[in-house]
Amino acid sequence: MNKSKLKTDFICIATSGYTVDGRQITAQELHEMAETYDPEHYTANLWPEHRRWFNMGQVIELKAEENEKGETQLFAIIAPNKELIEYNRAGQYLFTSIEITPNFRNSGKAYLSGLGVTDSPASVGTTELKFFNAEQKGSVCGEFIKVDFSAKEDVEEEKALRTLANVFKKLFSILRPNGKNEPNPNNNNHKEDHAMNDKQFAQLIEAVKGLDAKIDNHFSAKVETKEPENKPEEKKDEQPQSVTAEQFNQLLITVQALDKKFNELSQEQTTVPSGVPTVEKENVYSLNGYNIDLSKGF
């Protein structure tokens, strides 16, 4: 027997009188079925179109009552299973049709031996089955979120561009230390200036190498990405929204050329006449191999 907690109230499953196909249901049969029905003794199952393939629930209780027209009606409490509920939700098996055993076990009385669920009932006045509320309140629905998998590629391109910008920022900070291209008047030791430049050049080289590796990884990952088979046709008139691999390579070549030029400049030393020791003088500075004595004026 179905142990489901879902049970209906009393619903009308038959009305005395003639059926739509010409058969007759007597009031006495309906009263006898209400009197004799015992699900512990014999359970009337719910059968789809009266076929014994699989049941769709059970009949729990019966009662018979007279209506205003003087007709006897048989009422039942039924317990549908999930299959019947799903069919009913789809608009199927909306009514019931009783199965009467006239002389049940030689008792001389009728017994409800089964109850069909159908869309074409023979008896009139049967209650339409409805196991759910079409307008249920308090339903919880998930929010639709569009996932754009191309966003990851855009983020990678943005990171590469940001890295390139940081390299040029370091480059310009070397060209203009402290925001000005002026020597430090309190520094008479040009070797210290060269040492600082070497350190800064080393930082630039590391930054360029790191950028080179990141760009290679970035575009090699894009090459390995498989394109969808049914790729939508791209519009030729649209302008590209990101930096191409060729543009990145051109920028990288430019940075490498600057790196080479700075290496050459960093290796230049102050020209000193042969055999004459270098004498440190105040207000004398070296610029690209030339000594400038600011004390003498210009």
Curated annotation (Swiss-Prot):
The active site is at D21, H50, S97. The keyword Protease applies. Coiled coil: none annotated. The keyword Protease applies. One of its GO terms (biological process) is viral procapsid maturation. The record marks F131, F132 as: Cleavage. Residues 223-243 are annotated as: Disordered. Autocleaves itself into an N-terminal fragment containing the protease activity, that remains in the capsid following maturation. This is Capsid assembly scaffolding protein. InterPro entries: Capsid_scaffold_GpO. Its EC number is 3.4.21.-. Keywords: Hydrolase, Protease, Serine protease, Viral capsid assembly, Viral capsid maturation, Viral release from host cell. It comes from Haemophilus phage HP1 (strain HP1c1).
